[in-house]
Amino acid sequence: MAKLGKAWQSLAKIGKDWQSLAYIIYENYDQYDGFVILHGTDTMAYTASALSFMLQGLKKPIVFTGSQLPIGIIRTDGKENLITAIEIAAATDAQGEPILQEVAVYFEYALFRANRSSKVSAHQFEAFASPNYPLLAKAGVQIEWFQERLFRTQLPTLQAQFEVSNEVLIWR
């Protein structure tokens, strides 16, 4: 387990944290079967998307998750989100290969492609959506995988791009 310090204070620091996170995964890639990242919800989609472009050639899962309610609150969504994110990251096919081989966001029973996810609500448990790409999986009693939607890289090995620019404007 690695912790990246306190909450981000500014957009300038976010780029550095993305670099740190990408570097930690890159340096530990061969030691683990997958990665689950607990993240605040306000910037989770941005971080997950950035990592999906910074780390190319993934053959292992990187699953982002978090919660709308703090983990200590009895009705928190965080426990289910964390447990299912771990289950998704550990899931393998009949050949023992990870089912998920990309960066994704898991939230409230839904698995989204990271660079197609967006936070859509600060007040509902269904806080994320993917208006431009369908779900990768849906969790219920079983996890229902939509295999035809899962990304498979053609790159032979993991490649990392650690440089990011802070000169980007987010316009809504």
Give residue spans per PLM region.
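Accessory alpha-helical/coil subdomains and C-terminal extensions
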Residues: 113-172
